[in-house]
Amino acid sequence: MVTIGVDEAGRGPLAGPVVAAAVVLCKPRPSGLDDSKKLSAARRAELEEKIKRRCRWAVGVVEPDEIDRLNIFGATMLAMTLAVGALCEQLAHDEDVGEVLVDGNLTPHGRRPEWCWPARPIVGGDALEPCISAASIIAKEHRDRLMREAALAHPHYGWERNAGYGTPEHLAALREHGPTPLHRRSFAPVAQLQLL
């Protein structure tokens, strides 16, 4: 039986996808795992490389148009479901999922029809459970990379620095240049601009 850790990155930004990662830790597990928000960028990148090289992992990505259609909660549950489903495809036929540990107070169980694994929510799990810590690192690094790439096509918004969050720089660019296809139109600052 394997335990899978799941976490997401990108629920709060005004632009870009929400990304979930699912990780089955290797033995011995990489040392220094912690909540991705507590790690320096250099340490996160180092741990991401170790996790990707030595552990089994997958990501689920839900784009802004789907976030607008489902709402951010539904999109997060979908991203988690996609990540766990993709990871389970990597497992050997004789490996069963014992439990999926999800950062937060809710899981996709009963909220996504495709979710078929036993799940347990853990508030603050990204700092408490190493497999969730690993997932938080993979999710954040993956999403940050996507936003750096998106910044090349949309340079006015500073996404390589703010990852799509509503910083003063991003809000000023949004007012001046308007929303891009990567903006979440259901999020208040973007929706309010569309009403003007």
Curated annotation (Swiss-Prot):
Keywords: Cytoplasm, Endonuclease, Hydrolase, Manganese, Metal-binding, Nuclease. Residues 1-196 form the RNase H type-2 domain. A divalent metal cation binds at residues 7-8, 103. Manganese or magnesium. Binds 1 divalent metal ion per monomer in the absence of substrate. May bind a second metal ion after substrate binding. One of its GO terms (biological process) is DNA replication, removal of RNA primer. The keyword Metal-binding applies. It is an enzyme of class 3 (hydrolase). GO terms for molecular function: manganese ion binding; RNA binding; RNA-DNA hybrid ribonuclease activity. Its EC number is 3.1.26.4. It catalyses: Endonucleolytic cleavage to 5'-phosphomonoester. One of its GO terms (cellular component) is cytoplasm. InterPro entries: RNase_HII, RNase_HII/HIII, RNase_HII/HIII_dom, RNaseH-like_sf, RNaseH_sf. NCBIfam families: PRK00015.1-3. Endonuclease that specifically degrades the RNA of RNA-DNA hybrids. This is Ribonuclease HII. It comes from Novosphingobium aromaticivorans (strain ATCC 700278 / DSM 12444 / CCUG 56034 / CIP 105152 / NBRC 16084 / F199). The gene is rnhB.
